[in-house]
Amino acid sequence: MALKSKLVSLLFLIATLSSTFAASFSDSDSDSDLLNELVSLRSTSESGVIHLDDHGISKFLTSASTPRPYSLLVFFDATQLHSKNELRLQELRREFGIVSASFLANNNGSEGTKLFFCEIEFSKSQSSFQLFGVNALPHIRLVSPSISNLRDESGQMDQSDYSRLAESMAEFVEQRTKLKVGPIQRPPLLSKPQIGIIVALIVIATPFIIKRVLKGETILHDTRLWLSGAIFIYFFSVAGTMHNIIRKMPMFLQDRNDPNKLVFFYQGSGMQLGAEGFAVGFLYTVVGLLLAFVTNVLVRVKNITAQRLIMLLALFISFWAVKKVVYLDNWKTGYGIHPYWPSSWR
């Protein structure tokens, strides 16, 4: 009886060990299958970024047992928000693809299968957005092998982590995953065929260009070009165009009280709209052109009466333009500009 009991215990132990080993091999095979499928999906993308949907998130994250043999860096995108330039979604997605391609090019061995770059599009994967708890874009998150709760925001990339675009993203990846991204490999601005065509055109056009330069018949010899260029630069400089470009200021705003009304002038010294800058630039340009006309053209008019009338008209228009600029400055800043007349005039 004792022998029979020992035999039963031995058989039970063998069965337990067999099932354990079978489960272990099964998990190993499952992980290997997931890795192979991720590698296959990555190979179909030019930049190595895998397009995932709700089914892919379920397969590679929620249904896969932890710890997973890979990490996923996920870029959350929404095509309907691409028109909002302040979000910079298209630019960040392009830089994200550059980091992915650089990582893939610099890690051809086993290190290349430890991290995969993925993207999720809102219109096709709304459930995944809810699963991750993403309610604002841009959003980039690293899902490490041990993460089981996808709402864990410990792997979220801060705005400072993509301030320098691809370079900052690469630093984030290297810091969090301990993997080496390697040098960022940006695509050239021009392909080799394009460079060849440009060089051929330059070689063909060089003799004709030299001939026209020697004869003084190029566009650079036209004084009207330089005059137009000077006016163009003057207008955009006094209009504060560089300020608007650097700060990405809109041309106008929508009135909060009346959505059908547009605001072209913003009251406050800390902000200038594009239309407002162009209006001020136009007034300054009018004064500058009148001054140039008076000092270079009007002095050649032989009729004294005509000279005086045109001079008075130019002074009146200039005074009106400067008055409008001063009024706008007073309205925006609250600081008044008052004339000080000589005491003998009072």
From Swiss-Prot:
Residue spans, topological domain Lumenal: 23-189, 247-277, 330-346
Subcellular location: Endoplasmic reticulum membrane
Secretion signal, residue range per the UniProt entry: 1-22
Any Pfam family the entry gives: OST3_OST6
Membrane-related topology note: Multi-pass membrane protein
Glycosylation sites: 108
UniProt KW Secreted keyword: no
Primary location: endoplasmic reticulum
Domain of life: Eukaryota
Disulfide bonds: none
Record function comment: Subunit of the oligosaccharyl transferase (OST) complex that catalyzes the initial transfer of a defined glycan (Glc(3)Man(9)GlcNAc(2) in eukaryotes) from the lipid carrier dolichol-pyrophosphate to an asparagine residue within an Asn-X-Ser/Thr consensus motif in nascent polypeptide chains, the first step in protein N-glycosylation. N-glycosylation occurs cotranslationally and the complex associates with the Sec61 complex at the channel-forming translocon complex that mediates protein translocation across the endoplasmic reticulum (ER). All subunits are required for a maximal enzyme activity.
Family of the protein in this entry: Belongs to the OST3/OST6 family.
Protein name: Probable dolichyl-diphosphooligosaccharide--protein glycosyltransferase subunit 3B
Species of the source: Arabidopsis thaliana
Lineage of the species this protein comes from: Eukaryota, Viridiplantae, Streptophyta, Embryophyta, Tracheophyta
